[in-house]
């Protein structure tokens, strides 16, 4: 009987389960503060599990990605689209930073006080702080959650192991798969954690706490829509000198729609390849560019990382300098490229960006937990942006005469 319940839960729709957790959490938070405090233990366990796995995930994900990917045989078109993917992701993260400055959001978090120590603001202080984090002992970086140190050692290790044997690379691929399975297991428990977090949030902060979540979600979705209809439109016009919107709407209708519901760029690869074929793009090109885009073209993830990191800074009262904002755009860009194929990957990389502002690791993980609460909508919109942009950029880089008469 018990095993059947577990199997039924494991096979259930995670979105539906999270929605049920949110509703039950609100009801418990309103009706009983005592039960909410008990339920909060589930939230604490969930965030603790995320805190434990996140450093290892970032390290092994980036190291494996660098040491196993090979673009040396790629032609000029592939090199162009790699550049376009990275530039598009950077512009998306820069838009997210600007959106936060114009429409800052502060979260209502239980037990979070205004920061007594602001982040460094002078250029010399910023680079000194970054330098010491970068050269941190790798074991200490993993244990303390120093994500800049983790990122540095992961990149260094990936480059050093670039030319190791295929057998050695396979070991890292297998370890990476093992870590991803652990992450998927933890994320599958998200409904219980979210139930506890929502119940405690409603009991402690009332409707004000939930309202801050809604404001954050609106900012995220609005920024992603701006990237879709303004930034991507400008990129297409720059490349083609033609009206970008017919192609954008084709990509939205035939790619973003499916990606919104699958919530997986990888699962949407066959849909995107079929669309590229209908558009008249060379199979030799889109056969490489579409899977590649599902790996490194992560504009939506960059928006999520940048906005949630700056929201964490706003919440604790840290003022962000222009230099820090620029550095965040760069960090969000490359962090987003490592978020593919991981359930909640963009959320788990938020502590990496938060480390730039000396934000306490516990606070960063509370923001990550809130990300899972709003992720029911945020992750769908993020994936729709990521996946549809793969086709959009492939089309303009292909130099083929495109077929716009697609039904």
Curated annotation (Swiss-Prot):
Annotated transmembrane regions: 12-32, 42-62, 81-101, 141-161, 179-199, 218-238, 245-267, 288-308, 330-350
Key word Glycoprotein present: no
Its membrane topology: Multi-pass membrane protein
Domain of life, per lineage: Bacteria
Keyword Transmembrane helix attached: yes
Molecular function (Gene Ontology), one example: neutral L-amino acid:sodium symporter activity
Pfam families named in the record: SDF (PF00375)
Cellular component, GO annotation: plasma membrane
Protein location: Cell inner membrane
Gene Ontology BP terms: serine transport; threonine transport
Residue stretches in coiled coil: none
Keywords for this protein: Amino-acid transport, Cell inner membrane, Cell membrane, Membrane, Symport, Transmembrane, Transmembrane helix, Transport
Catalysed transformations (reactions): L-serine(in) + Na(+)(in) = L-serine(out) + Na(+)(out); L-threonine(in) + Na(+)(in) = L-threonine(out) + Na(+)(out)
Disulphide linkage map: none
Function: Involved in the import of serine and threonine into the cell, with the concomitant import of sodium (symport system).
Family from the record: Belongs to the dicarboxylate/amino acid:cation symporter (DAACS) (TC 2.A.23) family.
HAMAP family: Ser_Thr_transp_SstT
Name the UniProt record assigns to this protein: Serine/threonine transporter SstT
């Amino acid at each position: 009987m018990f095993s059947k319940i577990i199997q039924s839960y494991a096979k259930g729709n995670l979105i539906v389960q999270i929605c049920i957790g949110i509703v039950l959490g609100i009801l418990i938070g309103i009706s009983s503060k005592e039960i909410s405090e008990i339920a909060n233990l589930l939230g604490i366990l969930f965030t603790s599990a995320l805190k434990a796995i996140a450093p290892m995930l970032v390290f092994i994900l980036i190291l494996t990605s660098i040491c196993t990917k090979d673009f040396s045989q790629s032609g000029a078109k592939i090199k162009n689209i790699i550049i376009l993917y990275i530039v598009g992701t950077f512009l998306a993260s820069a838009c997210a930073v600007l959106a936060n400055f114009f429409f800052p959001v502060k979260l209502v978090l239980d037990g979070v006080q205004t920061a007594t120590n602001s982040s460094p603001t002078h250029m010399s202080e910023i680079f000194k702080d970054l330098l010491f984090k970068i050269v941190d002992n790798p074991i200490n970086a993993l244990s303390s959650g120093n994500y800049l140190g983790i990122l540095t050692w992961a990149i260094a290790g990936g480059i050093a192991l670039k030319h190791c044997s295929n057998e050695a690379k396979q070991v890292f691929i297998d370890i990476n798969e093992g870590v991803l399975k652990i992450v998927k297991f933890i994320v599958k428990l998200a409904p219980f954690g979210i139930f506890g977090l929502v119940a405690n949030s409603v009991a402690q902060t009332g409707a004000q706490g939930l309202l801050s979540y809604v404001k954050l979600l609106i900012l995220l979705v609005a920024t992603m829509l701006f990237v879709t209809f303004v930034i991507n439109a400008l990129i297409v016009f720059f490349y083609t000198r033609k009206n970008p919107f017919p192609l954008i709407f084709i990509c939205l209708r035939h790619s973003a729609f499916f990606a919104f519901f699958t919530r997986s760029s990888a699962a949407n690869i066959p849909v995107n390849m079929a669309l590229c074929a209908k558009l008249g793009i060379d199979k030799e090109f889109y056969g490489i560019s579409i899977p590649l885009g599902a790996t490194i073209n992560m504009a939506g993830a960059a928006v999520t990382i940048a906005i949630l990191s700056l929201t964490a800074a706003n919440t604790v009262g840290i003022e962000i300098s222009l230099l820090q904002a620029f550095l965040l755009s760069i960090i969000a860009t490359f962090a987003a490229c490592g978020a593919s194929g991981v359930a909640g990957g963009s959320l788990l990389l938020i502590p990496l960006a938060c480390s730039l502002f000396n934000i306490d690791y516990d606070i960063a993980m509370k923001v990550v937990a809130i990300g899972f609460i709003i992720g029911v909508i945020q992750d769908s919109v993020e994936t729709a942006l990521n996946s549809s942009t793969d086709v959009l950029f492939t089309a303009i880089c292909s130099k083929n005469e495109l077929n716009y008469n697609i039904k």
